[in-house]
């Protein structure tokens, strides 16, 4: 199967993922191969809310948020395969082998490369890598589970 190139901007991403500011961590999808692979971009700026406290005078993107960005990229890939995606959420079921190799700082552009290891209708295991330029910043294996999305309260 030929690799599908597909660019999605943040507006397109918001049609797939339920995340919003300040926790939407994807700015663009630059590669998308159904049920196999996704490559997404996160542009990191000093305006990120987490830099206020992590760490004053030495801003570093929290590693857990890099892993979250990997999971969001995987979610963007896999939720498109769910027929009733507006009624489902993809949530963490596990994080394995997370390694942080290089700090991510304001001004960096993080390239998230996520490959499907196992895909089932209700769960997936993904291998993700986050790069800044050609340097590996983070890698992790994440497991996700698809669950029903709670109904919105009528007054929201």
From Swiss-Prot:
Belongs to the thioester dehydratase family. FabZ subfamily. One of its GO terms (cellular component) is membrane. Keywords: Cytoplasm, Lipid A biosynthesis, Lipid biosynthesis, Lipid metabolism, Lyase. It is an enzyme of class 4 (lyase). GO terms for biological process: fatty acid biosynthetic process; lipid A biosynthetic process. Involved in unsaturated fatty acids biosynthesis. Catalyzes the dehydration of short chain beta-hydroxyacyl-ACPs and long chain saturated and unsaturated beta-hydroxyacyl-ACPs. The active site is at 54. It catalyses: a (3R)-hydroxyacyl-[ACP] = a (2E)-enoyl-[ACP] + H2O. Transmembrane segments: none annotated. This is 3-hydroxyacyl-[acyl-carrier-protein] dehydratase FabZ. Its EC number is 4.2.1.59. GO terms for molecular function: (3R)-hydroxyacyl-[acyl-carrier-protein] dehydratase activity. PANTHER family: 3-HYDROXYACYL-[ACYL-CARRIER-PROTEIN] DEHYDRATASE (PTHR30272:SF1). It is found in: Cytoplasm.
């Amino acid at each position: 199967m030929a690799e599908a190139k597909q660019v999605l901007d943040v507006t397109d991403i918001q049609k797939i993922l339920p995340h919003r500011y300040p926790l939407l961590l994807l700015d663009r999808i630059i590669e998308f191969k159904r049920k196999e692979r996704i490559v997404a971009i996160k542009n990191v700026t000093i305006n990120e809310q987490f830099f206020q406290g992590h760490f004053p005078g030495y801003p570093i993107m929290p590693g857990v948020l890099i892993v979250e960005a990997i999971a969001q990229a995987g979610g963007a890939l896999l939720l498109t395969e769910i027929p009733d995606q507006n009624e489902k959420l993809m949530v963490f079921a596990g994080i394995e082998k997370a390694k942080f190799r290089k700090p991510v700082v304001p001004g960096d552009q993080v390239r998230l490369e996520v490959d499907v290891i196992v895909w089932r209708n209700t769960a997936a295991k993904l291998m993700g890598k986050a790069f800044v330029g050609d340097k590996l910043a983070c890698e992790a294996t994440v497991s996700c589970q698809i669950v029903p999305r709670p109904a919105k309260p009528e007054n929201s």
